[in-house]
Amino acid sequence: MKKDTFTISVYTENNIGLLNRISAIFLKRHINLESFSTSQSEIQNVYRFVIVVKTDAERVRKIVQQIEKQVDVIKAFYHTDEETIFQENALYKVKSSSLFEERQIQNIIKASHATIVTVSPEFFVIEKTGFREDTEKLRKELAPYGLLQFVRSGRISVTKAKMGISEILESFKNNN
């Protein structure tokens, strides 16, 4: 079966243990989570989990159905990359001497459309928002200049098409 990348959005109340129950669904099916992030949704007290997996369409459909059976889950959806607008954020901590001694590093930062967010005598921090390929490319380019730390967020995304979640969340808000 052909594996594709899917973004699963789970709208939920923020209750203890739900993350564990959701991750167990993937564990039982031997599906690795490529990315996971969570945040407040557009409705107060409703949270959104964004989960990225590589699997086939039938398996992701079944996973979403299983997630929706969980208590505390309001609704879950899945989308392909073509159906979403998505980004990741990355931070790079680099030796300060590189910034002042290596002209090339300034060119790399400028060409990648990254931003220097802080500078200290020992290090500076660069922030880059983009696709995983973009943040990974910058990581590889910075490595020879003394990359001290690197961290990348999970995917954040919105759908291109209107989702029916707005009405569901509004109904949820009015009932609680």
Predicted regions and their residues:
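Long, contiguous binding/interaction regions
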Residues: 1-47, 52-176
